[in-house]
């Protein structure tokens, strides 16, 4: 792979997809295997949504919670996650992420190497971002939030 220069973008110009139409999570594809030797996405889980249990032969997978609450399951270990939590899953470990909170769960996920995960995402149906997604991803605060009397 030859990387010609800086990879730069904005989430509003990125593809948004699901792996399958029935999935309870969607992906904002920030950077894929054609741009760098890894994939980076914002994974958005609907309330009650989850990934299927899965593992990767070679890839390390890094998760950082941007918003919401959930559970990370790695092997037999299960732990609560919330905004600011992060965890790394080494290759060969079965893992799953579940949204257990009220509202959506937003997770920045990076997988190194890509292991063709970006191809799997790009082969799925298109999805879209709604107002709540745009608010969370842009860092905007809801009306009245962060004000002091």
Q: Where are the model-predicted features located?
A:
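Short beta-strand His + acidic residue motifs that chelate non-heme Fe in jelly-roll/DSBH
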Residues: 52-54, 72-73, 89, 95-101
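Short acidic-glycine-tyrosine-enriched beta hairpin
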Residues: 76-91
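A short hydrophobic beta-strand segment most commonly corresponding to one strand
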Residues: 42, 88, 103-120
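Conserved short histidine dyad/triad with adjacent acidic residue
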Residues: 25, 41-56
